[in-house]
Amino acid sequence: MTPRLRRRGALLVSVLASVVLLSSCGGQTAATPHQQQAQAHVDVDTAALRAIKQRAGVEACPTPEGHGPVRGGMPAVTLPCLGGGNPVDLAKLRGPLVVNLFAQWCGPCRAELPYYQKLHEQGRGKVAVLGIDYQDTLPAGALQLAKATGVTYPLLADPTAQLRVPFRVRGLPGVVLVDAHGRVVHEELTEVGSYQQLRQMVQRYLHVAL
């Protein structure tokens, strides 16, 4: 093999390794200035989005009142309700609560959404479920995904990735569990592989049997 061919072969191996590494990432990388500007102008409350939300049957966002931030609780970040509704101060949320970080561009998220919906249905009155559409510039796509997968639990939007630092988000999907006192008792960036896995997580960390 000539030196030129060896160099080409080494370059090809390097490129292929980079492709494999990127394909294994669960989420988007840090946004460029152009992407950040686009994310900052994402409107998550329009007449069209409200119509999609209504057709999908997505419930209204929670309105936590009378609570303040707690040590070890959710971050003091206020997010808009996807498809219209009251914004929510995450620091005021109380559980038992399961928060799902997802996006319409995330393949694994699509697969696990039905498990969260089943938890929403079977855990009604015992544990609440809340979705957060993370770093997503296509809110209509997120609501259409909710409709396609049967999701009806409340959905917030974080198009500018305000939760990147508090939750150390490097990829999606993610799950956060909040107890009755508002404390985050468990968080991980992982795909839930089954409803059984999600149910066991709720029982272990929130002490709620379903």
Positions of PLM-derived features:
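Short active-site neighborhood of thiol/selenol oxidoreductases, capturing the structured segment around
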Residues: 87-110, 116, 129
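N-terminal targeting signals for export/organelle localization
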Residues: 1-80, 210
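Thiol/disulfide oxidoreductase modules built on the thioredoxin-like
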Residues: 144-151, 159-210
